[in-house]
Amino acid sequence: MVTIMITSALHRAADWAKSVFSSAALGDPRRTTRLVNVAAQLAKCSGKSITISSEGCEAMQEGAYRFIRNPNVSAEAIRKAGAMQTVKLAQAFPELLAIEDTTSLSYRHQVAEALGKLGAIGDKSRGWWVHSVLLLEATTFRTVGLLHQEWWMRPDDPADADEKESGKWLAAAATSRLRMGSMMSNVIAVC
């Protein structure tokens, strides 16, 4: 049943979005419905902008941007809904791989000036740092889902950092253990 759901979700963006995000606690069921719709459109046009994924429908595009700008929408609630679906799917597998890594998302357009430092002192690259834990089924390497993700902006002056970035790895491991509970004994961490 779970394997069928994963396979189906890979082929139908709307099914995937509904299975991953329909339990998001956004304070109003209309927001959750909008999240599912926006996620489905973006998944259907993977790697494309909201404008392109809206396929010429201005109402869909404006709805997506209003959703993103809504102060009542919590990125943490969205991430948590996805992680909880990952935990639910993980129950079907006897052995899992938790792939953990940090990467950067580099931006060059106008808004990039407000983002964090990515490179060395003289480097002008700006963007986000993202630390993720991706859960895979161990024998087929099929993606189960995203178990944890945290993103932050690095300050221009390293002395202004709130914490050492190595702490992101420890926090990810602790969150993974908390979410997986007794299933953690089935998980092989790959860092």
Language model segments and positions:
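Conserved, well-structured functional cores that handle cations and Mg-NTP chemistry
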Residues: 2-191
